[in-house]
């Protein structure tokens, strides 16, 4: 490995050595020697030694069944340890300029100064900064919570070992602890035995808040405050809330029959319980710290005239409030029917007394104390509120239409589902304006309809602060949005809820502007939304529908059109981005992705999903989370203060061509190639993936459908396992080569240099190409697919090689990712350990498919390879 990364190399080597010791102790020399042989052969094969590649294949084929699991686990664990070493390296003191970006906020301030941006404008933009990260439990978070906690502790050990002034005793103790943690990981289940319930997923989300975000938010705000004082001579307002969180865990019922209104209610209670629990820890710490006696009149009044330690007296009142709240919520979670409400209902109940203490300390000459733990708690109160994270509700559009269809049939006025869009809108607006209830008392709805209505009642019974948005998946029309407003109104919802259409397919993205325009033409609707509209842009389904190039342009187009509609109509627009970790689902480095969006599209702030495994990579450790917040904040500020250029008309025209050609190329394979579905099923572990106890959602929306009914996640996950990563590149390079052949190379090069949207697209493709491995993909084909399907695989791999040449040609680069040596190195480092897992997986798929009846031993080994490859590929789905 490059000497620039010596500290990382040293940590990876040390962790590998300790893992080797654990394997030797658990399984003896034979298994350790097998693992070492396979590792060395893999390294040699990577370097181009064909003989060793053949030896590697034979070595794996000859493994008896009982050795497959320990060997697979060895490489799986090694990849997890490599990930933790790499993640730690990005925040360690050894991290150099090749790896760590210079501080994102300071770099931005320098750039703003060079461009003559007024400091008052900068201060205003910072006051308006609004980053909302929406945590979602997508099934690609393969690593169990048990393992994640161990990995966090391993990280802490690496941090200690970096200190040069450790005594021999301290160093020895830390090394022993590290060895114990690695042994604990080895002897724990790598993967879950049962699918997590939606409740398990929600608890996983709360664990991320407790272990990382609770500390990261005040740390980030403290750092930002200091930078602002240096640059603007004014700090961050104490009540600023530039970053806050929502969640889909326990609220996302789209295609997930396990998320019921009962589950949602329980998650809401758990969320409040966890918030009270975390605040209680803060308050207990403050009680021990704030023993001062001097205070202002406000605190004296709150504490009582006779209290010698007034701050403690106020904090003890809060302690009682929080303890009582926990007790009542606990009883409700455990099914006790209590009429009494939990005492803590609003943020003000925490904020007002704490802020009074803060002001008093400052007024009495104790600013140093006020700016310590107390300020951190105040910042948390603003960021997390009394609900910890706000819950989004997501439901598919047809479920709402089915409620109205059943209702209108009962009322004898026809079938809502058979009405024209015009008639639906007339009915909905009429009912929204009506003072009488729509739902008859004697109506007995079917179970699916009752479930939708019960969910709306749960929303109506909570405060507005409990919820983020009501997201309508597969939204296509204005009536889809109005229907939800009507159902919420009929359920007695007393506040304005953000009802957010999610436009997912290519056609729906292209139609988004017309839908929002139509809604804005309805006066009654404008009154409902109180001048604010949220729209969600779907990345994964549009890419699955049309390929990444066409989907990317449709997303850009839709955002641009929606921004223009919002300006014309004088409404505030929040664009909600449904990105995943992979390119096929919109994943890109955050900073680049945000700066590649249309001008003005971040004016309403950023709302974006953080999904599955990306939560751990970007937010799983406090220091890593602070880096992520900095990156998001600097990108939003830059996009709003130094907006990207409006694309030239000739760029747009060429993008239209690229979009059309790439979509046709993508669909000609995925939809038009008769052998494609059998090839996909045989050459990837798609069928076996359905058995993996990942997320709580089924892998298909329709259990009997083909590729089109597959969720975007298993679709992409399957292709990342066999290293062809087809959905993340198919069609894009072909369209670029087509444009070069038509004489547009100079224009493509100009777009690459001057247009962030286009250069980011190519950068994302480069990363995908580097993660692809044609030899591995061919090995899967040869081992698993019918001979008649092999020519299709060869054609796809030939296309991949042509596409790589086309992209490098436009970028004038010789190698993939040459402008990002750290990213390049990071992928190469893991490849040595992923490839044996790929070989093992192909062998396991072969054995399980041949056997027909799968032994538990083989199934476990297969699951371990799936989890390991996902850990190695990083952005899995």
UniProtKB/Swiss-Prot annotation:
Active site: 138, 544
Keywords for this protein: Carbon dioxide fixation, Lyase, Magnesium
Cited Gene3D superfamilies: Phosphoenolpyruvate/pyruvate domain (1.20.1440.90)
Cofactor or coenzyme needed: Mg(2+)
Catalytic activity: oxaloacetate + phosphate = phosphoenolpyruvate + hydrogencarbonate
InterPro entries listed in its UniProt record: PEP_COase, PEP_COase_bac/pln-type, PEP_COase_Lys_AS, PEPCASE_His_AS, Pyrv/PenolPyrv_kinase-like_dom
GO biological process terms on file: carbon fixation; oxaloacetate metabolic process; tricarboxylic acid cycle
GO cellular component: cytosol
SUPFAM superfamilies: Phosphoenolpyruvate/pyruvate domain
Pfam families the record matches: PEPcase
A GO MF term: magnesium ion binding
EC number: 4.1.1.31
Physiological role: Forms oxaloacetate, a four-carbon dicarboxylic acid source for the tricarboxylic acid cycle.
Protein family (similarity comment): Belongs to the PEPCase type 1 family.
Name of the molecule in the record: Phosphoenolpyruvate carboxylase
Source organism of this protein record: Vibrio vulnificus (strain YJ016)
